[in-house]
């Protein structure tokens, strides 16, 4: 935790370590958003309509043609960055479990109300997740028209395809030039190596792998209105947009890849708090009114801290003593296991309570 510009608390458990480069999963979406904000500032002439720029065109996404649904013509960059494109991505079922996956559903949100959407399963999950990384995102099914509902999915990867075409380089290289080098990050990368092969492109929907202190540096950059030392690395106008509700998403408290607490749905946290969760319980939080940045590490499975996923060298000896730990089951006095997102919000409330007690 960083408070008033100082590292005031740091504690690691199990495989977590200061030098670890875990797959932070959807925390990576925050960085995709930041990169898009920088892109729009540096290439303003390419985005005369700003976030309202329609991007399913030959200029930005020629790979998307022919469009799988004519409604895609109306998708704006702001829709991609708030998960309101209307695209429903395929579910990648494990071999032999396709029937189970098909029977499940995803939960969309329309003006605060849940909408259950039946899963659809990719017929070739290995190909879609690896070789056709871009195409499988671009050719999802439309469950509603752009802007008409929120659904957590692969929209930010599509935004990263737009970025790749506009700036002429991969998302990881762009982040390295615009943030990592100026801020002095240590070893970092993306979890691009999968069981089915290596991804051809930086995954815009997640997978960034930073040291814990560099994750905090990024949060501190946001808390300091996009400034690092004497440089404005992130456009202030974009930072102001991502930290409050977005007109592109009237359905849920999710702005430009950040959960925002303006509505007070995290009751124990200030309403100016904004943050992002990652699978398994990762969380990176900014609370401007308390001048506080928090990073919560976690683990989804054995692959989370596996250096084979990132290709980065292991520079420490992992502590495996907690590998078999499991939470206490539910009873009258114990809540039992909770989901990653619930845990992320609860952790925010507990840290805030400790800071203001």
Model-derived segments and their meaning:
Residues 1-16, 284-285, 291-295:
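A short, well-structured edge-of-sheet supersecondary motif
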Residues 6-11, 56, 93-145, 169-189:
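Short, charged, amphipathic alpha-helices and their helix-cap/turn boundaries
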Residues 23, 27, 41-88, 92, ...:
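Active-site helix/loop module of the DD-peptidase/beta-lactamase fold
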Residues 37-40, 56, 78-82, 118, ...:
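Non-transmembrane alpha-helical segments in soluble domains
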Residues 67-68, 145-149, 202-207, 271-280, ...:
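Active-site rim elements
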Residues 155-162, 206-228, 282-299:
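Active-site-proximal alpha-helical segments within enzyme catalytic domains
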Residues 185-188, 192-193, 241-295:
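Active-site Gly/Thr loop motif
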Residues 276-357:
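Structured C-terminal helix/loop/strand segments within mature extracytoplasmic catalytic/sensor domains
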